[in-house]
Amino acid sequence: MAQLSGQPVVILPEGTQRYVGRDAQRLNILAARIIAETVRTTLGPKGMDKMLVDSLGDIVVTNDGATILDKIDLQHPAAKMMVEVAKTQDKEAGDGTTTAVVIAGELLRKAEELLDQNIHPSIIIKGYALAAEKAQEILDEIAIRVDPDDEETLLKIAATSITGKNAESHKELLAKLAVEAVKQVAEKKDGKYVVDLDNIKFEKKAGEGVEESELVRGVVIDKEVVHPRMPKRVENAKIALINEALEVKKTETDAKINITSPDQLMSFLEQEEKMLKDMVDHIAQTGANVVFVQKGIDDLAQHYLAKYGIMAVRRVKKSDMEKLAKATGAKIVTNVKDLTPEDLGYAEVVEERKLAGENMIFVEGCKNPKAVTILIRGGTEHVIDEVERALEDAVKVVKDVMEDGAVLPAGGAPEIELAIRLDEYAKQVGGKEALAIENFADALKIIPKTLAENAGLDTVEMLVKVISEHKNRGLGIGIDVFEGKPADMLEKGIIEPLRVKKQAIKSASEAAIMILRIDDVIAAKATKPEGGQGGGMPGGMGGMDMGM
């Protein structure tokens, strides 16, 4: 409500909540920090897990930051911004989601200290932007260049990513699967590797143990052969991929045929049968002995395919058809009549196998397949879900290193190096912006501090020790949470991709700056649900629900 010549002027609807200036900033910072604190205890190899129970009673137990934030139902807009940080980090780098969110939360905490000293948000924003830009330069400078073909380095990267997750006890196997899968689908363009992770399929099947998980150099499809008389195993398979139903096509118009005699009916049925037989005859003439169809297969067509000894699978997902094409070299045809021998793909074996009581189709032994499947096994659904999350992170970080050829020591070492160098940079910049740069540098120490805290170590003592040793022994010194002391992360093979760290700092600083720019929050009154009681805005932000 505003006033003009002593008369009140109503601008916003009744019930609207408005927070201006410091109130808006405090509430947004508080919401963002709550999100950061929620995931902070999951950071690092000694991080704890979260149990998430949805409205249907489904349970997820994980310490994966992206999964946790994706499953939590949030209402507060600033909290949702923090979730976007995690999503961006996951999309761009594949790992480091918790790191990005924790740094963003700490940057906002340190910004609040400056706001309390009456430093204007614009000055803090400028200082943070300068610090973030300088941090990117420093990371590029301290990064260690590696050979993308060096399997040992790739295995270390994958193992570091899996460490601390529930699947850690099988990290050697899972790291090996991740590296082999990425190397198989990687393609060189202009002398650099390009990896499309869409070409790696994760197929989960509860049963057996995690150690039974395997890499299939081809495609595994959760389908079965359509006809009992068809072969269940075909060697030297010539594979046809058809994006058309093997059925009699229905007319687009509502045409009607008047049949007045049994002969006409017989003739009509014979014509339908001939059309289906011609389709199958054409497939057989190309030399195909395995057919994958994206749509349906008529019962009669199934019968003729079985007579020819052709294995057929129907209603295959489009994504699986594309992977089959990349694995076998087959071309997807949209019209059976257009199918030629040149369109067929090859696999040494196509076989229907029973796993955990269900039939699955294995397409294996492809010549240099550019699509592969990681078959995940485990005792329960919870186990295989966690293994899948671990493998997803692992293949992403291996992709990062193969594409960029650069790594950093882990264990908080890069953050310590950045904190030291940004402190020096702040002295060069001078002015009030220097205070923001110093606070940015100090905020980065939250990563080594949290690693120590989650490992049950004395955080103050450990931070002093690790910074001192880092200055004396070099940038590889971080916190070894297993031995509870500073150690050279490079010597121990505890490394992470440069891309992960750069993106984490970029995402965190951008989110913090975006939240600091907000000085006015206008929250509309919640509408009443149909047939239920209203009640305005629930509590949490004085009218804005924290959603937790």
Swiss-Prot record:
BP term (GO), one: protein folding
The record lists the lineage as: Archaea, Methanobacteriati, Methanobacteriota, Thermococci, Thermococcales
Matching entries from Pfam families are given as: Cpn60_TCP1
The text of the family note is: Belongs to the TCP-1 chaperonin family.
Please name the SUPFAM superfamilies in this protein's record. GroEL apical domain-like, GroEL equatorial domain-like, GroEL-intermediate domain like
Q: How does it assemble?
A: Forms a Heterooligomeric complex of two stacked eight-membered rings.
Q: Tell whether Chaperone is among the UniProt keywords.
A: yes
Tell me what this protein is called.
Answer: Thermosome subunit alpha
Skewed-composition ranges (Gly residues): 531-548
Q: GO MF annotations for this entry?
A: ATP binding; ATP hydrolysis activity; ATP-dependent protein folding chaperone; unfolded protein binding
Which CDD domains does this UniProt record tie to the protein?
cpn60
State what this protein does.
Answer: Molecular chaperone; binds unfolded polypeptides in vitro, and has a weak ATPase activity.
Task: Give the gene name.
Answer: thsA
Q: Does the keyword ATP-binding apply?
A: yes
Q: Which residues form the signal peptide?
A: none
Q: Which domain of life is it from?
A: Archaea
Q: Keyword set for this entry?
A: ATP-binding, Chaperone, Nucleotide-binding
User: What segment(s) does the record annotate as region Disordered?
Assistant: 527-548
